[in-house]
Every structure is written in structure tokens, then in C-alpha cells.
């Protein structure tokens, strides 16, 4: 069956931080797809390049002059072929000409257009009969590169295990609110800020943040009679300087960082631990996983950057038991799907994730279902975050009706 691409348009739009990003429209017979690409603040060294080194306008110009003509008429049902064509025309190996964000927008828009033409939802088109609804994982206290004057650890996370996805998402909101009240009581004369992902941001030590997080979780869990997991994203690359991990009030050696990551599981009951080590330290990750992987998820984000080859290396070294998936880290839906397949075959869980600079696009909601994700990491509040949460709630309704 052929489904020729009839038209493609790309444009600049704004993301949730007010920065320019790209949006792509793809038209096929009886189908249309539109995708706006997100952007990260904390990015891995091995991610594809978001835009041409000359900027977003240069990426768009490269598309118009070098790419568009080759895509018109291409069979939209051949997703892997389309994505390979994007990669080949770019020719750089890391999308430094077209830009990984524009590649992501194009790749996802083709999938959306094909799904609409076939009359099926995107999650079904990408994932087939798979119909696992993930649990929402949302950040409630922020620091690192996502918030000024916040904690050294970039994200403190919660995931409620309610009877439905929407109930779970709402309980995460209640934890967020309770933490806001607690911080207002603790810092009566200081204005409490919010970070890029609508987390609370204030000059706290990491230990104080753990205490407040656990107190809020305990209270809401008791009130709602629901289990609530806690988690962190160390974003250790942003802490790493000259072989050390530099926090606000202390500096840790590699061995001390490993011990610290292990201790938060034991001392604070943290279940989800993302990027506890620098992104080349596969062995450091492996030591943490070997010691606490039976009771905690050790998640690779910057370690893997959704790159199938890096995930294969992690599998070989037993570095983690879970992987974060972000399409615009690797540039195409096909490559992200391969990353999930490699991880799943090795028995690793996957978590589909947003970026700090988001849009109201909801494609990651569909991917989290299509990929059978254990969690979907997409914040707690804010229109660009809630757009994904509400879409998963709608998908759950369709699957259970």
C-alpha cells in the first residue's frame, strides 16, 4: 500500500520557556500530522544536535533547500525508510545540518499523518496491540539546570499508584501542592519560585528536600490510601567537574558518589534513581545497579541518550535496569523504537520522558503507551505537561471502555 506525502511545511514556534523551536506539518491522502519538538536544558554529550550550528533558521533553510524535495511523494507508511532518508540527506551522523529537533518533528508528523489516514490512533499505529498504561512520574522539587537557587540534585520526583491514570496524576498534584504549603511555612519571608518544569525551587539542601518530600508523600499517601513512589534525577553530568561531583556544600569522589546514590535508596526509600553518575561511567552505574537494583530502578538518560548502541553497551555491562526515552535525543521515531526494543529484549524497563522546554504536543503520551513504558515522566502541572497527562487519561478510557 502506498500513502504518498503530498505536502510538508515547517515553521518556528515557541516552547514553554519562550525559546524558538520547530513545528512540522505533513499532509497525506486523508491524513494530516503536526508535531512541535521540545528542547532540553540538561542535555547528554552524545545527543544529536538540536539545530544547525548556525541556528534554527539555518536548519529550516537546509530543509527547504536540501530535504523537502526528496520527501514529497515518499510513502508515509514506510516509517523506517523515511527516517533513514532524513538521516542520509543530513549526512552528518548527528543531525548537525538538519537539526535533531526538526528531524524529530518531521518523523513524528509522518507517523501521525499515516495513523490518521488509516483511521487508528497514534499509539496503535506505533505499538500495535500493545496497550500498557504507564504510571505518571512527576517532579515536585527542582534544582540543577532546571531552576535557579534550587537543590544540587536536579529533580525530586513522585509517582502515585492510583486506581486510574488520572487519579494517579491528581495525587501527584496533591503532593506538589502539599510541598508548596510546607515550603511557604518554612520560608515565610522568602518568595518560593518555580523551575522550568513547574517544580518548586528554593534554596534547600538536598537532605532538606528529601525530608520535605517524604513528609508530604507520607501525608498524602495516608490521606488517599495510595502507594506513592519517590525518585530523583541527579543529572550527574551537571555536577561533574574534573573527576569530582560538586554539590553546593560538599564535593564527592567517584566512590563517594556511588555510596551516596546507594544511601538515598536505603535512608530515604527512593525507588527511582536517574543518572547518578557521569555519562561515560558505565561501570559506576553497574556497581549501583548490582547493589540496589533489586529494589530500585537505576535509570540511564544522559548515559544512553536514547542511542541503541549505547544501550547495547549498557546491557553488556549491566549498567542499569531501566532506560529513559526521548525521541529528540536520537532524532527519529525509528531510532527511538529500536532503543526501546534493545532495552526490552534485555529485560530493562523504559520510561518515556518530556524535556524541560516543552510544547503542548502530546505525541509522547502515545509513545508511552506504544512502548509499554513503566512510567511516563512529564511533570505534574503546567499546560504543556498536563496536555500529555490528559491524553493518556483519554487513551486509558478508550482501552477500558
Swiss-Prot record:
Molecular function GO labels: magnesium ion binding; phosphopyruvate hydratase activity
Enzyme Commission numbers on file: 4.2.1.11
InterPro entries per UniProt: Enolase (IPR000941), Enolase-like_C_sf (IPR036849), Enolase-like_N (IPR029017), Enolase_C (IPR020810), Enolase_CS (IPR020809), Enolase_N (IPR020811)
Places the protein is found: Cytoplasm; Secreted; Cell surface
Residues involved in Mg(2+) binding: 233, 274, 301
Pathway: Carbohydrate degradation; glycolysis; pyruvate from D-glyceraldehyde 3-phosphate: step 4/5
Taxonomy, superkingdom: Archaea
Cofactors that this protein relies on: Mg(2+)
Gene Ontology CC, one term: cell surface
Note accompanying the cofactor annotation: Binds a second Mg(2+) ion via substrate during catalysis.
Active site per UniProt: 197, 326
Pfam families per record: Enolase_C, Enolase_N
Gene3D superfamilies: Enolase-like C-terminal domain, Enolase-like, N-terminal domain
Catalytic reactions on record: (2R)-2-phosphoglycerate = phosphoenolpyruvate + H2O
Function per UniProt: Catalyzes the reversible conversion of 2-phosphoglycerate (2-PG) into phosphoenolpyruvate (PEP). It is essential for the degradation of carbohydrates via glycolysis.
Protein name as catalogued: Enolase
Provenance organism: Thermoplasma acidophilum (strain ATCC 25905 / DSM 1728 / JCM 9062 / NBRC 15155 / AMRC-C165)
Amino acid at each position: 500500500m502506498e500513502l504518498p506525502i503530498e505536502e510538508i511545511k515547517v515553521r518556528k514556534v515557541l516552547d514553554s520557556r519562550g525559546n524558538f523551536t520547530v513545528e512540522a506539518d505533513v499532509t497525506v491522502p486523508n491524513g494530516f500530522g503536526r508535531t512541535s519538538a521540545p528542547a532540553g536544558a540538561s542535555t547528554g554529550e552524545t545527543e544529536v544536535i538540536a539545530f544547525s550550528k548556525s541556528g534554527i533558521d539555518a536548519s529550516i533553510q537546509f530543509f527547504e533547500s536540501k530535504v523537502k524535495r526528496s520527501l514529497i511523494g515518499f510513502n508515509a507508511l514506510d516509517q523506517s525508510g523515511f527516517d533513514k532518508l532524513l538521516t542520509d540527506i543530513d549526512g552528518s551522523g548527528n543531525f548537525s545540518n538538519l537539526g535533531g529537533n526538526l528531524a524529530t518533528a518531521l518523523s513524528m508528523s509522518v507517523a501521525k499523518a499515516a495513523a490518521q489516514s488509516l483511521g487508528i490512533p497514534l499509539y496503535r499505529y506505533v505499538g500495535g496491540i500493545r496497550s500498557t498504561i504507564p504510571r505518571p512520574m512527576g517532579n515536585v522539587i527542582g534544582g540543577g539546570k532546571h531552576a535557579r537557587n534550587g537543590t544540587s540534585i536536579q529533580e525530586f520526583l513522585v509517582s502515585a499508584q492510583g486506581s486510574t491514570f488520572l487519579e494517579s496524576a491528581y495525587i501527584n498534584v496533591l503532593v506538589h501542592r502539599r510541598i508548596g504549603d510546607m515550603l511557604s511555612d518554612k520560608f515565610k519571608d522568602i518568595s518560593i519560585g518555580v523551575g522550568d518544569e513547574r517544580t518548586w525551587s528554593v534554596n534547600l539542601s538536598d537532605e532538606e528536600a528529601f525530608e520535605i518530600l517524604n513528609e508530604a508523600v507520607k501525608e498524602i499517601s495516608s490521606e488517599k490510601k495510595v502507594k506513592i513512589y519517590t525518585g530523583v534525577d541527579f543529572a550527574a553530568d551537571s555536577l561533574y567537574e574534573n573527576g569530582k561531583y560538586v554539590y553546593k556544600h560538599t564535593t564527592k569522589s567517584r566512590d563517594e558518589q556511588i555510596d551516596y546514590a546507594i544511601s538515598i535508596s536505603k535512608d530515604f526509600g527512593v525507588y527511582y534513581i536517574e543518572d547518578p553518575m557521569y555519562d561515560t561511567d558505565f561501570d559506576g552505574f553497574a556497581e549501583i545497579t548490582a547493589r540496589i537494583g533489586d529494589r530500585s530502578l537505576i535509570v540511564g538518560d544522559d548515559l544512553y541518550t536514547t542511542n541503541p548502541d549505547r544501550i547495547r553497551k549498557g546491557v553488556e555491562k549491566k549498567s542499569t535496569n531501566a532506560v529513559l526515552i526521548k525521541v529528540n535525543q536520537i532524532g527519529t521515531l525509528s531510532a527511538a523504537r529500536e532503543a526501546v526494543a534493545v532495552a526490552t529484549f534485555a529485560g530493562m524497563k523504559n520510561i518515556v520522558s518530556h524535556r524541560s522546554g516543552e510544547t503542548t504536543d502530546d505525541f509522547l503520551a502515545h509513545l508511552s503507551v506504544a512502548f509499554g513504558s513503566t512510567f511516563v515522566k512529564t511533570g505534574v502541572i503546567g499546560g504543556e505537561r498536563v496536555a500529555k497527562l490528559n491524553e493518556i487519561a483519554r487513551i486509558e478510557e478508550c482501552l477500558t471502555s
